[in-house]
Amino acid sequence: MNLIQLPVEELRCFFINIFNVLVLHSKVTSKAPVDDDHVVPRCSFFRNTSYQVGKYFYSLDDICRGVLRAKKCLFLDCDPRIHFALSYGTRHTPQARVFGAHSLDSELDSATRNFCTDRVRVDVEGGVVTLPLLCEWYSKDFEASGKTVIEWVSAFVPPNVAAGIAAASARKDLRVVYE
């Protein structure tokens, strides 16, 4: 398989699916669970867990940071919606699912909307917007669009939540909480 010859959306879809399968495969076969609260084992897990694709080995870290986040890859732009498609097998990330190359755009929209609808909360009176931890971890990816994280997320929540975010954001004492 020559990955360079794949259209960009097929390539993105391929690596999202490989990432999710690799996480699931590794968690099932690993003796030591990797959870949200243990940073060192998690970092090691992402650097050392890999699949061979053709002649090359791709670790979870290579796939997420290098290919999908476009840090080492010249043929893909970073699409922040990938963060709502990648499952790390933790409570702070979405559940693993398989994506289709020909419907990837709409599936990424749907995954993003579903995750944000479940996780984004707003307290207008208190001036607090609660966002998923993913938004803090990858804030630079969201902000690369020219929007703040809050503005970016507002496009993927129900209208009443987006209106609440806008009202809370107008306050001088706005607080953003990540959980």
Q: Model-derived features: where do they sit?
A:
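Interaction/scaffold regions that mediate signaling and macromolecular assembly across diverse proteins
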Residues: 1-179
